[in-house]
């Protein structure tokens, strides 16, 4: 990385938010935290001063999370985005995908996640272990995204655990890399910073 990466962090009122903030700071990033009830114009004006927008986990649906979805839409083409859990779901919604109740509610469960062994997941164990905390899931992936990590479900179905829009530099993960249940979470966050800058 050249210079100190600057992260604009959108806090969606989640108890995990500051664990993520701490991880980015530990890796040398300067992190500016704003809550999702901040006016959109205030956040939009700050985007160009940052290398990465992080959309945090949070409760509820993406559409109900304050300025989350409109901010993501205002960010496209201006700044890379990393969405975690609710942030991942919001990327899907902002780009025309769909989010629905998950077939299983999972809160604090370690899961085996498969991946495409490319990009931020290159060289990760196949599968790797990640912490899941969600009751919603992306059920229709937007056309511009490719699924890069998933969980094998009954009947051969794949539940998206990560997706990326390469052209617009949008990356979302359903699992929580900052959780102690995610063995390589710190490595993933370090790679996300490198990817962004």
Q: What positions do the PLM features span?
A:
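Extreme N-terminal starter segment of soluble prokaryotic enzymes
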Residues: 2-8
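Active-site-adjacent helical/loop segments in soluble small-molecule enzymes
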Residues: 17
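Short amphipathic alpha-helix with an adjacent loop that forms part of the alpha/beta core around
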Residues: 40-49
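Cysteine-nucleophile active-site neighborhood
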Residues: 6, 50-122, 129, 189
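Catalytic beta-strand/loop cores that center a nucleophilic Ser/Cys/Thr
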Residues: 119-167
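A short beta-strand-loop structural module common to alpha/beta enzyme folds
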Residues: 30-38
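Acyltransferase
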Residues: 180-197
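A short, Lys/Arg-enriched amphipathic alpha-helix followed by its capping loop at the start of a domain
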Residues: 23-29
